[in-house]
Design a protein with these regions (language model features):
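Beta-propeller blade-edge signature
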Residues: 1-5, 100-101, 160-162
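Active-site neighborhood of phospho(di)ester-bond hydrolases with catalytic His/Asp-centered motifs
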Residues: 23-27, 43-55, 71-76, 125-128, ...
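Metallo-beta-lactamase
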Residues: 68-124, 215-232
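Active-site environment of divalent metal-dependent phosphoester hydrolases
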Residues: 29-32, 52-57, 77-81, 96, ...
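Active-site-proximal loop/helix segments of hydrolase catalytic cores
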Residues: 109-186
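Short beta-strand scaffold segments in enzyme catalytic cores
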Residues: 11-16, 113-117
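Binuclear metal-ion centers of metallo-dependent hydrolases, dominated by the metallo-beta-lactamase
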Residues: 5-11, 85-95, 156, 173, ...
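Pre-active-site segment of Zn-dependent metallo-hydrolases
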Residues: 12-48, 52, 59-64, 130-159
């Protein structure tokens, strides 16, 4: 059976496998994908929040508190819950096991962390705000520090192959838009790369990207609510 990915908005996705619904960085769900799934599904529901930025974290997720198995969040996320035992706060380097779900938090080059999740026999990586944040017009020292920090975080990755990787391709970076994702692909081989965090015009891979990674399978959602089946 294929797993299914639902694009919510920005960096928000639902990853559905045979037993679970994994919700990453829920911010908006304009097409009500989650509510629709929950009407007919008894699968275990997990929320993942990489950090507290408003485009990655919506406190409204607590309205599913009774339905959810767990809320797995970076420790900088503040969320008041009636069922505090369902809340699991992590920092980079932590590993958490809940049932058949194993979660490792890696670092970020902005706020919070990134998630490596093993569930249903698959390995899923969600980068959060981990990226090579090079900005035209910023001081050279700042951009050099951003480069150093990014490659330092990449060096920590022990998993060289994943089934699905969600990674930022931010339009605001202009010429540097692909620097982070291309460097990530030099370190890790995802069977499917999913573009996120566009912040503007939808990413169309450059000739350089396609020349370097001609065999890389991509999903670049076009609109909120888009759906992708993964290969078995």
């Amino acid at each position: 059976m294929s797993d299914i990915i639902y694009f919510l908005h920005h960096s928000g996705f639902i990853y559905e496998n045979e037993t679970s619904l994994l919700v990453f960085d829920f911010y908006k769900d304009t097409e009500n994908r989650l509510e629709t799934l929950l009407k007919d599904s008894t699968k275990k529901l997990y929320f993942f929040v990489s950090h507290y930025h408003a485009d990655h974290f919506n406190r409204d997720i607590r309205r599913w508190e009774e339905r959810a198995e767990a809320y797995i969040m970076h420790k900088n996320c503040w969320l008041t819950m009636d069922r505090e035992e369902k809340k699991h706060l992590m920092v980079p380097g932590d590993t958490l096991t809940i049932g058949d779900l194993t979660v490792t938090m890696y670092g970020s080059t902005d706020e919070g962390g990134s998630f490596l999740v093993k569930s249903g026999g698959k390995t899923i990586f969600h980068a959060g705000d981990l990226n090579w944040w090079h900005w035209a017009g910023e001081p050279a020292a700042d951009n050099l520090a951003a480069r150093r920090d990014f490659f330092h975080e990449l060096s920590r990755f022990s998993e060289r192959q994943v089934d699905v990787a969600f990674f930022p391709v931010d339009a605001r970076q202009q010429a540097a838009r692909e620097w982070g994702v291309m460097s990530y692909l030099e370190r890790v081989e995802p069977k499917l790369l999913v573009a996120m965090h566009a912040f503007g015009k939808r990413w169309l891979p450059s000739y350089e990207f396609l020349w370097h990674y001609p065999e890389q399978k991509l999903w670049i959602p076009e609109k909120d609510g888009d759906v992708k089946e993964t290969e078995s």
